[in-house]
Amino acid sequence: MADSYTELEKAVVVLVENFYKYVSKHSLVKNKISKSSFRKMLQKELNHMLTDTGNRKAADKLIQNLDANHDGRISFDEYWTLIGGITSPIANLIRQQEQQSSS
């Protein structure tokens, strides 16, 4: 990874690398994560952000709806949709905290 990457570029690289870390090397379906591995990834990698019951429920609902083609696996595009769905409420929370601290 280039040292000259911006913070945002580094964050994107981490998200991409994290997806491929959980793709099974023994999977017959390349570049997809099984739902069970995906849940493990969420528990391990997003544990602190998903400790809030609302966030966890939202993630569970997204997982149910994520598998657009119903193949039982999560593609990179489906993963990216989940990341967006999880970060949206977090962004709202951060914005609220900033507004409260500036009041």
Swiss-Prot record:
Q: Which PANTHER family match?
A: PROTEIN S100-A16, S100 CALCIUM-BINDING PROTEIN
Where in or outside the cell is it found?
Answer: Nucleus, Nucleolus; Cytoplasm
Gene Ontology molecular-function annotations: calcium ion binding; calcium-dependent protein binding; protein homodimerization activity
What is annotated about its quaternary structure and interactions? Answer: Homodimer. Interacts with TP53.
Work out whether the entry's keyword set contains Lipid biosynthesis. Answer: no
Question: Which residue range or ranges hold the EF-hand domain?
Answer: 12-47, 54-89
Comment block on domains: S100A16 proteins, but not other S100 proteins, have only one functional Ca(2+) binding site per monomer. Upon Ca(2+) binding, undergoes conformational changes leading to the exposure of hydrophobic patches which could be implicated in the Ca(2+)-dependent nuclear export. Binds Zn(2+). Ca(2+) and Zn(2+) do not bind to the same site. Does not bind Cu(2+).
Q: Which GO terms describe its biological process?
A: response to calcium ion
InterPro entries hit by this protein: EF-hand-dom_pair, EF_Hand_1_Ca_BS, EF_hand_dom, S100/CaBP7/8-like_CS, S100_Ca-bd_sub
> Which positions does UniProt annotate for Ca(2+) binding?
67, 69, 71, 73, 78
Q: Could you tell me what this protein does? A: Calcium-binding protein. Binds one calcium ion per monomer. Can promote differentiation of adipocytes (in vitro). Overexpression in preadipocytes increases their proliferation, enhances adipogenesis and reduces insulin-stimulated glucose uptake.
Q: Which UniProt keywords apply?
A: Calcium, Cytoplasm, Metal-binding, Nucleus, Repeat, Zinc
Q: What is its main location?
A: nucleus
Domain of life, source organism = Eukaryota
Q: What is this protein called?
A: Protein S100-A16
